[in-house]
Amino acid sequence: KFTGKRNSMLELCSIASGSSGNCICVGSDNHHVLIDAGISGKRIENGLNEVDLKSQDMDGILVTHEHLDHIAGLGVMARRYGLPMYATAGTIEAIKNTPSVGKIDPELFHEIVPQEDFVIGDLTITPIHISHDAADPVAYRIKKENRTFAVVTDLGNYDDEIVQQLQGLDTLLLEANH
């Protein structure tokens, strides 16, 4: 949890992390997103309830890549709550070809491009291309006012470009179980 001016709070909560599933909640006072939905919808709902949030409070799901430990609950959350999903073109295509996720309304997919900022509410999000054995994996750098952190999962290798993208952070969450 970050603290600063009352309106600049930025929070991060790990709901699940590990080879059996990954899901992180990131939020400000007014807007919240999930990074990955790699556990059941029920476990996501329970995890959010533990931090006094509801699935309906989420403004979207940022998908890092298409492996099941990152998308297992994606279809359920999309169908149940109509949550928009943000992912690269390669990841979206791979998700659409993953039968266990089930049918997802194509309107819920929003294509993102590495190194191109996009905004969800008061959160500015920058996808960062990373090395991993997936279609088109990314990490996420998230900023609200003067607070910035990044969430990096399943990083295969790193190079100078990734190191540069991660400069100037207040916090780095590096998931290192891969």
Residue ranges and their predicted role:
Residues 41-87:
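Active-site metal-binding motif and surrounding structural segment of the metallo-beta-lactamase
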